[in-house]
């Protein structure tokens, strides 16, 4: 192995020969990153991306000033989806080293499963990967049940079964229980529900190539809530939390669902399918019904649900929706504490009524007269949350994945949101 390139931190500007406002410069000993005191974490992340772009695959964080946040910022920019990189980390105290190690374990897991090709990450694969991670961090405190294929139909998980039946790979529901006390009667503090569409062709409302080429990442919500629970456990979570992953491929076949089909859910709601590419809300509905039945204090669902959220926020923020102002504010406080970006978008009672159908109680997509697609999608989901006005958060995961590299990020998954949700779970 070649000798590691040393990366140091400097609070002095770079020599003029490196250019005005240079992020970094080469020194006799390696590379110096020039901090300005303004968004130093962002600067370090951008420098990490540039250093990786120069083909330097073995580096050492050296000298003074490195703490867990600066080390992590460097890694977020330096890490890419292909090729191996090694970092010799600067010395940290025991608490910071533990935090860094857990971020590397869990958030890298999230990025890896989202980046994996759909051929390798089908519904069953995703569910099993989630089980493996949580069993690793939670040990005997974790139990789970997997329901798949026709068993879903027999148990009336009609949204998940309907969406997934068109694929040769059967749909899967993972119900996982983290119960630190071991008491079967212990109250459930929170339920986390994740959309796990492992490939989304759009179904018969088929996507164009430009919108389909990143759809291996349509299980980003499932990865996010799985990682959030795992990371919360590493931070000492001592409350009972249930994880529900709704995993399926959305494919075209002779057995795939069609426009005009009507889905009858266990809570009595009927939904007319008028767009098979609005499938995420159909599978999440089953998970939210199960979550509501647990009577938890907190329900969080996460999904790469709408293009409308990306149009509003780009890939820089996750979109947050809630009727519970106090809870939404606590989530935003957790995001600020963890240096992650969330932005609240509107969700009002009238959004719940913008899904008209001539043949069912709800349409799975709003009509042309109601263009607020991210808000109406959240409104749809609210019909499957028993007490939707309190204790429910919906995350539209617009920051989960980037199709192209930018100055701070390589192409692919980001891992944004894991720390925020873990913070909320452990702080509540």
Curated annotation (Swiss-Prot):
Give GO terms for biological process: proteolysis
One example GO MF annotation: manganese ion binding
GO cellular component assignments: cytoplasm
Cofactor(s) in the UniProt record: Mn(2+)
- Copy out the cofactor comment: Binds 2 manganese ions per subunit.
Catalytic residues (UniProt):
207, 281
Q: Which reaction does it catalyse?
A: Release of an N-terminal amino acid, Xaa, from a peptide or arylamide. Xaa is preferably Glu or Asp but may be other amino acids, including Leu, Met, His, Cys and Gln
Subcellular localization(s) per the UniProt record: Cytoplasm
Q: Which residues bind Mn(2+) 1?
A: 200, 277, 279
| Binding-site positions, Mn(2+) 2 | 195, 200, 218, 279
> What's the Enzyme Commission number for this chain?
3.4.11.23
Major subcellular site: cytoplasm
Q: Which UniProt keywords apply?
A: Aminopeptidase, Cytoplasm, Hydrolase, Manganese, Metal-binding, Protease
Enzyme class, spelled out:
hydrolase
Gene3D superfamilies on file: Zn peptidases
Q: Does the keyword Transferase apply?
A: no
What HAMAP family has UniProt attached to this entry? Aminopeptidase_M17
Note the subunit structure.
Answer: Homohexamer.
What does it do?
Probably plays an important role in intracellular peptide degradation.
Homology family? Belongs to the peptidase M17 family.
Protein name as catalogued: Peptidase B
Give the originating organism.
Cronobacter sakazakii (strain ATCC BAA-894) (Enterobacter sakazakii)
Name of the gene this protein is made from? pepB
